[in-house]
A protein has these predicted regions:
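N-terminal helix-turn-helix DNA-binding core of bacterial DNA-binding proteins
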Residues: 17, 21-62, 84, 88-96
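A generic local structural motif
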Residues: 25, 75-76
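Alpha-helical residues within the helix-turn-helix
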Residues: 57, 74-75
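Short coil turns linking two alpha-helices in DNA-binding domains
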Residues: 62, 67-69
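Amphipathic alpha-helical dimerization/coiled-coil segments
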Residues: 1-22, 40-45, 94-122
Length: 122
């Protein structure tokens, strides 16, 4: 298991576990153009998120299609949904976004040792 530290504030950290299977599922969800557009729109919206109707208007996506794509993003943990009165709000789970980015970049530029390199060194 891979562990990524997420900074909540200057003095608070906690660990989110991330593995290749989880990361692949999240990247697969973002690999669809409509879901990527939804996600980027929600990132722009910030912590308050957007109501589903506003997402639909902004992206000109049919309601049933939008519902399907939002459900996929929520299933993989990238988007949170909640009800406020009669409206459903969607927002990005920024801790999970940071965990995914951390997973992708954790070992950046640390070098790679291939089997042949190890044998040559021996």
């Amino acid at each position: 298991n891979f562990r990524n530290t997420v900074v909540l504030s200057e003095n608070t950290h906690y660990i989110i576990s991330m593995n290749e299977e989880t990361a692949a599922g999240r990247l697969e969800a973002l690999g669809h153009q409509t879901r990527l557009s939804i996600y980027r729109l929600l990132v722009k919206a910030g912590d308050d998120g957007l109501i589903v109707g506003d997402i639909q208007k902004a992206l000109d996506v049919p309601a049933s299609t939008l519902s399907h794509h939002l459900a996929k993003l929520a299933r993989v943990g990238l988007v949170s949904q909640g009800r406020r009165g009669r409206e459903i709000y969607c927002s990005v789970d920024y801790d999970e976004m940071r965990a995914l980015i951390g997973f992708l970049t954790e070992e950046c530029c640390t070098g790679v040792t291939l089997e042949q390199d190890a044998q040559d060194a021996a």
